[in-house]
Regions:
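Mixed-charge interfacial surface used for oligomerization/domain docking
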Residues: 3, 10-27, 32-33, 86-89, ...
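Class I S-adenosyl-L-methionine
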Residues: 33-102
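N-proximal short alpha-helices
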Residues: 19, 40-44, 66, 114, ...
Length: 188
């Protein structure tokens, strides 16, 4: 039986030792250029493009087809996504799972909204791997991960609000005042 962990790139995990794992990249649009958030991404080039860009940046979640392709060949699938508050990745994965089950009704798929990003997603992925390695069955793993998610959270600090202002998430005036007063936003 093949058990597979799949995550979008919001987790910043490219591979797992001794586990069936796949990372599906988010796409980041900056000034007419698309950057795939995967191992081929030049972080320095990407950061430079962000600094030089005065316009809006945006992201695109993995497509339903990308999720379905990643599901292929596995009997049990644990798909974890960046928070559904920030991305359509969770909805895309849920739709992909529903469509995939139509042709593969024996495949078990658990789509997990991390309600987070980055390091917290990595913790959930580690807990998934640990649960699989411990020999837990599908239902036990799903229950364990759902309970684990209730105990984790991510705190973060933003050095700048510039990108939030560029993308219409906050007022440019708020970003400017925060910058002048050297205010950093701490969130959870």
């Amino acid at each position: 039986m093949i058990k597979k962990i799949i995550s979008d790139s919001g987790a910043n995990v490219l591979h797992l030792d001794d586990a069936s794992f796949e990372n599906i990249p988010l796409t980041i649009h900056v000034d007419g250029t698309d950057y795939q958030d995967d191992a081929s991404l030049s972080v320095n080039e990407f950061i430079e493009a962000l600094h030089q860009n005065d316009g809006k940046t945006s992201t695109a979640c993995p497509s339903i087809a990308q999720w379905q392709k990643a599901f292929e060949g596995a009997d049990e699938i644990y798909a974890i996504t960046i928070t559904s508050v920030l991305s359509g990745s969770y909805n895309s994965a849920v739709q992909a799972a529903s469509l995939y089950r139509e042709d593969h009704p024996e495949t078990k798929i658990h789509v997990i909204d991390s309600l987070s990003a980055g390091p917290e997603m990595e913790l959930i992925i580690d807990k998934l791997k640990e649960s699989i390695d411990a020999g837990l069955n599908f239902d036990e793993i799903c229950a364990k991960i759902n309970a684990y998610k209730e105990k984790t959270h991510l705190n973060f600090a933003l050095e700048s609000l510039d990108n939030l202002a560029k993308n219409g998430r906050i007022s440019p005036a708020v970003a400017k005042v925060a910058k002048m007063l050297k205010i950093r936003i701490i969130g959870r």
